[in-house]
Amino acid sequence: MPSDSSVISNGHSNGSVNPLPNLQRTYQVVVAATQDWGIGKDGKLPWRLPTDLKFFKEITMKTSEPGKKNAIVMGRKTWESIPLEYRPLSGRLNVVLTRSGSFDIATAENVVICGSMSSALELLAASPYSLSIEKVFVIGGGQIFREALNVPGCEAIHLTEIQSSIECDTFMPPVDFTIFRPWYSSFPKVENNIRYSFTTYVRVRSSAAESAGQNIDPLLDNNSESMKFEVKDFSFLPKMISERHEEYLYLKLVQDIIAEGTTKGDRTGTGTLSKFGCQMRFNLRGNFPLLTTKKVFWRGVVEELLWFISGSTNAKVLQEKGIHIWDGNASREYLDGVGLTEREEGDLGPVYGFQWRHFGARYTDMHHDYSGQGFDQLLDVINKIKRNPDDRRIILSAWNPVDLKLMALPPCHMFAQFYVAHGELSCQMYQRSADMGLGIPFNIASYALLTCMIAHVCDLIPGDFIHVIGDAHIYRNHVRPLQEQLHNQPKPFPTLKINPKKKDIDSFVAADFKLIGYDPHQKIDMKLSV
């Protein structure tokens, strides 16, 4: 994909900046729009959002090279809607599109007039602009967006999503989500009683026509070749946007532990680098935080969570489905090593699912029917969310000191609290011990999925997932593979679709969950320490 001074020819990338007439600059769109794609009323913005204006100025003005500036491309009506004292917009090359030969401007400084979008992009691909202009941003209005939004030259769309209902008379075309995927979405903001958020969408495929030619089904298994992104490099994004991808929360924590972590011993004898007291916050409203810098075992995430929800403590249930993540802690050798010599192989004891569904019940073995025994915390969580959403005691705990000695492994992710506001469900989970290489990518996805499932059965929208970690550690034998992972650039997170017909937490099966747009880097092997 073209980068900072990129040009395209006949819809294809070209690394050259030679001023050939058939070459055009690529560009990014910056726009604020309502949920029905309204962008204006009576020739003006129908909202007053100072933070949005600040964002617009920052993204269109910032450059990575001090000697360069950005270009902003707009139609004549958009130009005229800018107050006279602010025209032209400072620090940027203002490119105004008009077919009117009599169009007059107050000053020629930093202003260029072009007759069409294509002629403007050709001009910006030619000298001197090919060398002096770093990025090109298209800023409106409606007709310009209709020409520019979903065509191959558009690399990204920086959209301020207005969630409040506001009357408009000017509209932009909808974003084509078959070719654009969300890169980053801010947490919602409220300003002047208007709720909104900032979202950047990046192009991942050449065109809707080419995607349609592949017969892409959005519910296909994510391993299908038809789900792979055509665009592999997203370095065209402004740095201020690129670094907001939420995967960097994880990557920066890993990098920090490798660089600054305390050397510690551990029960496995492997040795770790460790930091204490960390937090990551993920936005579940549009994306699903399944890491992309390595392939995460999605089927394993789903099946393990369903296993927890069922209350099962039998590792063989997962083994029969090809899920072997608990094999090490369920083996005969391991159970004997922790003093559970009378425990049947595969019986993990009163671990997560048992505590979620039968807290306080007396544990015998994995075969016993515990129906009606103990306290069903998960059902209690769902009932409180439905009946008393402002309750501050919506808690799910896997930590039961009485049962710890009976568990093959005490719970690492041990405590979750749920919170309802604005029709959204958020979850904060505390994890006492966090294996950053193998465990945390799984844990992030698992509790994000649990939050989405509970929101779904309670007719709420997923909100935030806040991951609080006590001992965040990297095993010594994971340092090298994690350093390999740190060299991978994140890709857009996928989105999650849940079967709308399922409304009972106990009714879900793995086929009820579909990922759309998961195209990670390759799997990176790391050895489990037990």
UniProtKB/Swiss-Prot annotation:
Identify a single GO molecular function assigned to this protein.
thymidylate synthase activity
Q: Looking at the record's lineage, which domain of life comes first? A: Eukaryota
Q: What does the record list as GO biological process?
A: dTMP biosynthetic process; methylation; one-carbon metabolic process; tetrahydrofolate biosynthetic process
> What PROSITE patterns does the annotation carry?
DHFR_1 (PS00075), DHFR_2 (PS51330), THYMIDYLATE_SYNTHASE (PS00091)
The pathway noted for it is: Cofactor biosynthesis; tetrahydrofolate biosynthesis; 5,6,7,8-tetrahydrofolate from 7,8-dihydrofolate: step 1/1
**What job does the chain carry out?**
Bifunctional enzyme. Involved in de novo dTMP biosynthesis. Key enzyme in folate metabolism. Can play two different roles depending on the source of dihydrofolate: de novo synthesis of tetrahydrofolate or recycling of the dihydrofolate released as one of the end products of the TS catalyzed reaction. Catalyzes an essential reaction for de novo glycine and purine synthesis, DNA precursor synthesis, and for the conversion of dUMP to dTMP.
User: What's the protein called, per UniProt?
Assistant: Bifunctional dihydrofolate reductase-thymidylate synthase
Q: From what organism does this protein derive?
A: Glycine max
Organism placement in taxonomy: Eukaryota, Viridiplantae, Streptophyta, Embryophyta, Tracheophyta
